[in-house]
C-alpha cells in the first residue's frame, strides 16, 4: 500500500472520532510527514503555479474532499500569501512539499466561543517551514488556530490535511482577518474580505487522476 493510501485509509478509519490533543495525532502525523513530492507525482522543477499579474493568487489542488476531512495541496507563487485566517473547531496538519513558507500564528485571548469571529488575539510566533525537514505544523481548535502563510522568493507547495473540513452548515466557514491595532503581542483582529484568490486548478492530469483514485478509498 502506498504512503498516500495508508494516510487516507487511516484517516477514514479514525476521523472524526480522534481526540484533538497533539498526543493523539501521532498515528496520522507519522504517516503524513513521510509524504514526498514523488508520492504525489509532482516533478519539483515543474511548479504547480502559473504566471499571474497581481501576485495574489494561490492555486488549490484537491486530493480528497469528504465529510470527514480534506486533503489538498496549496501552491504559492513567490512572495504570495494566504492572509490571516481561521479554522473554526478544526485540526490541520501542514507540510511543505517544496520551497519554504513563513507562518505567523495567533490565538484568541477569549477562546470560550467555538464560533468567535473578531476580538483580541495574541501573536504566538512565526515558524519557517521548508521541504528539507519533516516538520509538520499542527493547528488545533484552540491552539495556533489563526495563521497567515507567506511564501519567500521561490515557489512553494504545502500539503494540508484538515478535519473536520470547512462547512458553513456547521459554523466552520473560513474568515479572513486584518489586525486593526497592535499592542506588543496583542492584536485586535477584525474580519474583512482580502484582495486575494485561492483558485482551484484542474489542469494537472496527474493530480486529477490521483484525486479520482484517492477519493474511491474507504
From Swiss-Prot:
Name the UniProt record assigns to this protein: Probable 2-aminoethanethiol dioxygenase
Record InterPro entries: PCO/ADO, RmlC-like_jellyroll, RmlC_Cupin_sf
EC class of the enzyme, as a word: oxidoreductase
Name of the gene this protein is made from: ado-1
Coiled coil: none
Enzyme Commission number(s) of this protein: 1.13.11.19
Keyword rRNA processing among UniProt keywords: no
UniProt cross-references to SUPFAM superfamilies, sorted A to Z: RmlC-like cupins (SSF51182)
Amino acid at each position: 500500500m502506498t504512503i498516500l493510501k495508508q494516510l487516507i485509509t487511516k484517516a477514514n478509519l479514525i476521523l472524526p472520532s480522534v481526540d484533538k490533543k497533539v498526543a493523539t495525532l501521532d498515528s496520522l502525523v507519522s504517516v503524513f510527514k513521510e509524504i514526498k513530492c514523488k508520492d504525489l507525482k509532482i516533478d519539483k522543477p515543474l511548479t504547480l503555479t502559473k504566471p499571474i499579474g497581481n501576485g495574489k493568487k494561490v492555486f488549490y489542488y484537491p486530493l480528497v474532499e469528504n465529510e470527514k476531512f480534506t486533503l489538498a495541496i496549496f501552491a504559492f507563487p513567490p512572495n504570495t500569501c494566504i492572509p490571516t485566517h481561521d479554522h473554526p473547531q478544526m485540526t490541520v496538519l501542514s507540510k511543505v512539499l517544496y520551497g519554504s513558507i513563513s507562518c505567523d500564528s495567533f490565538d484568541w485571548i477569549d477562546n470560550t466561543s467555538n464560533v468567535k469571529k473578531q476580538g483580541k488575539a495574541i501573536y504566538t510566533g512565526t515558524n519557517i517551514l521548508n521541504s528539507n525537514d519533516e516538520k509538520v505544523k499542527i493547528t488545533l481548535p484552540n491552539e495556533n488556530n489563526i495563521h497567515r502563510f507567506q511564501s519567500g522568493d521561490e515557489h512553494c507547495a504545502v500539503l494540508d490535511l484538515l478535519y473536520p473540513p470547512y462547512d458553513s452548515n456547521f459554523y466552520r466557514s473560513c474568515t479572513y482577518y486584518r489586525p486593526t491595532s497592535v499592542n506588543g503581542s496583542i492584536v485586535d483582529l477584525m474580519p474583512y474580505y482580502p484582495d486575494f484568490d485561492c483558485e482551484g486548478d484542474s489542469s494537472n492530469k496527474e493530480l486529477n487522476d490521483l484525486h479520482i483514485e484517492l477519493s474511491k478509498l474507504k
